[in-house]
Amino acid sequence: MDDTQLGLLLSALQSAHAEITWFRAHRDGLGDICLDDFDALIVPGGWPSARDDELHPYLPKLAALMREFGDAGKSVLGICLGAQVLARAYGADNLLGVAREFSWTPLTVTEDGRKDPLFAELQPGFVSFQWHVDTYTLPDSAALLAESRLVKNQCFRVGRAAYGMQFHFEASGDVVQRWTSSNKERVDRIAPGWLESQADADRALHADDADAAGARIARAFVQTIQRPDNLR
């Protein structure tokens, strides 16, 4: 979607002086992306389902591209829709319309997650913003890193550093406010009355803690990105 914002993740990338190339696949397609030209691949959220190939014909190519990067040992990050596409890429099932979560949600780091660099600095429990109705089964080759009470498969890793995160760790409180205020009809469909009766209280209660956890995850992901030896 055009109003996707990388928030805390963008700040971490900029702090690491990353050179970022943007592709608006939903609007312009993917073109020819050469694996050797990039050190990492990040796929944020969006409105389609991960299997909506008829309306969004770029999705199969995106799934193949994510797997190509992951199989090459490069860092991959799929957020929300991106996580669902990564799960698809590694042979998992996409479960549509059965996993409604919205607003800041408690998450639990699994035993495998506590060993993973993305979650090593976090408390076993943390909060992060959610906005989805779909989920996925876990790829056979994946390690489950985080879960919630309602939706078990919240974060997984395949291989060295191909990560799928259902939750929006990158969305700071300010980003959430921009998203929800500019998509009021969509908010009302998933959480009727939330904007009027609960948004301010949820933000005041959870946003600061979620921002702190999200910033740690963002920095840790950036640290997984490996540059070619001749560029180090």
Predicted feature residues:
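N-terminal beta1-alpha1 cap of cysteine-dependent amidohydrolase-like domains
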Residues: 1-72, 193-232
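A short acidic, often aromatic-flanked loop/helix-cap motif at beta-alpha or helix-coil junctions
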Residues: 27-31, 102, 135-136, 152-153
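Glycine-rich, phosphate-binding/catalytic loops in enzymes
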Residues: 12-15, 57-61, 94-95, 146-147, ...
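Cysteine-nucleophile active-site neighborhood
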Residues: 44-113
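Amide-donor transfer/coupling interface in amidating biosynthetic enzymes
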Residues: 110-232
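Conserved beta-strand termini and adjacent loop/short-helix elements that scaffold enzyme active sites
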Residues: 23-25, 97, 131, 147
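Short glycine-/acidic-enriched loop or helix-start segments at secondary-structure transitions
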Residues: 6-8, 32, 52-54, 87-89, ...
